[in-house]
């Protein structure tokens, strides 16, 4: 992942920042890189595949114990390209339906597991902080199941307590924040709500793949022994089990 216009800031991250370079300049660098290195080590944009892949019935008869669900296809694609799913014996999907060719089949396999653990990996954005809520309450995902959901994503409070994070601001994000379900908003502090309502957000893609993978690995490892880690927080102890792992910061 190439981090555009990154700059270190020694102040609270409540003001949106601008890129130092133009899109055309960035494209020229990428084209030059391709001329020298080829396409081998660059991930293309996640593409939509209208045709589902055929999976052996011997495989579909089984299920996964764990799944990482990302709030965008690019992060899911990066994890898969780096064999994260093999190393952690888990499925990797995006809330947007990536990878399309096997998405429906894998989701059906997951729903058959009564002991499924779900790890949500997301941006510090309105759609990101709503990811766990959507996974829990959408009939397209894990509504009315026993799946336990863990939040491994970026949270606004982690951004507010950090320095040198690239904060983006948009009117659209502000509008989305103010339209978040009440159940999502009440799990956020007043400072977090103010930050989101101002239109601020931080993308996971602004961090290196190495760091994202490390955080996800560490989060999953901590969850294996939650009693030994004070960074694992139960935020809703009703019929739904949702945990937050304080990983970024």
Spans of features found by a protein language model:
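Nucleic-acid enzyme cleavage-core boundary/entry regions
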Residues: 1-116, 132-249
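Extracytoplasmic/secreted cell-surface and envelope-processing proteins
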Residues: 127-131
């Amino acid at each position: 992942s190439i981090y555009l216009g990154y700059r270190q800031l020694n102040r609270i991250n409540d003001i949106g920042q601008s890129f130092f370079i133009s899109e055309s300049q960035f494209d020229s660098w990428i084209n030059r890189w391709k001329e020298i290195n080829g396409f081998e080590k660059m991930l293309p944009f996640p593409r939509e595949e209208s045709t589902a892949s055929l999976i052996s019935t011997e495989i579909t008869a089984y299920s996964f114990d764990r799944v990482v669900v990302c709030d965008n296809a690019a992060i899911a694609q990066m994890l898969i390209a780096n064999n994260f799913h093999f190393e952690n014996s888990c499925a990797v999907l995006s809330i947007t339906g990536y990878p399309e060719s096997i998405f429906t089949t894998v989701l059906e396999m997951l729903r058959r597991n009564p002991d499924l653990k779900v790890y949500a990996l997301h941006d510090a954005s309105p759609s990101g902080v709503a990811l766990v809520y959507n996974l829990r309450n959408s009939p397209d995902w894990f509504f009315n199941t026993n799946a336990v959901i863990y939040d491994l994503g970026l949270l606004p409070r982690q951004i507010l307590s950090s320095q040198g994070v690239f904060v983006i601001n948009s009117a659209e994000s502000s509008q989305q924040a103010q339209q978040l379900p009440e159940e999502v908003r009440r799990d956020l502090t007043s400072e977090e709500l103010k930050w989101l309502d101002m239109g601020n957000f931080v993308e996971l893609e602004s961090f290196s793949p190495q760091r994202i993978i490390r955080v996800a690995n560490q989060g999953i490892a901590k969850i294996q022994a939650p009693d030994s880690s004070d960074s694992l927080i139960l935020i809703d102890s009703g019929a739904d089990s949702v945990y937050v792992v304080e990983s970024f910061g």
